[in-house]
């Protein structure tokens, strides 16, 4: 029997094999190739191939600006942070919208099912076609930019969709604030639980010697709250390892420079393979996320799931969809946004209370089994059918 053809549109996707860009859309798609013929349509990026196959998924990268080296709106990182970093990039936005529209116009008829990840721009552009589609809200695409024409276009996108999904219960409420008649399904992104674990542990991987290691992985942007984590580490006898890049890197490095030498290490972006070792070789994972000034919030961070799948206890803030994943004192520890004292106390508890440490790790194993990509992909495929 011939497989149905699935077209997935997204704006965050690996640019090549071994890229440091988030790969959750690729992970989801690669778990569907047994039942669907999957194609992903994503923006082009300097150095990336226009056409290739990654893990059984056909990838089409569309160009959106005449000068190719200026196609920097989406990578590395995401559209809104890229614009914040350099305001001039906003001139690329209409080119991206128009190019996506024309590429969809050319190929939509070839596909049976359409799935748009993020309301902006994929969902909005898709709403200008009559073909039914599924749209998924991931976080800031739902919670921020809710004024004027963009808000109206987002509401149109939600109302026209055949099915709306969001990655957290928190985002479900935010969608219903925009369009009260819409009842989204809550289906998170996931984690390939078989690929993470303590089997990847490497002794003294960070050069920490006898010190414990607190780990952060993520984009160095406002909503990640790394500035509060650095402040919390001032009185903690441990090393902080920061993995990732972003517009706040230089500012955060300057802040870290005020602490004792060697207390904070910035490793930059790392590949998926490197992250397996990094997670397994740390002691505690911290996700001190906050609500950004423009309303941008976490959805359900995949890095938290990856930490849990690696057997790493998590300290996180009550921000966005995180409390859906972490229950305070049961499978992790939670603190209020921007509360440096609570963040410090929770990290200290995990570093000094061995019984608590192991109890939380055992509970998070039970939690994360529900977020394996085989389960998540199955839920999406039920919607497609």
Please report, for each region that a protein language model flagged, where it lies by residue.
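Acidic donor-binding loop of glycosyltransferase active sites
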Residues: 280-297, 312
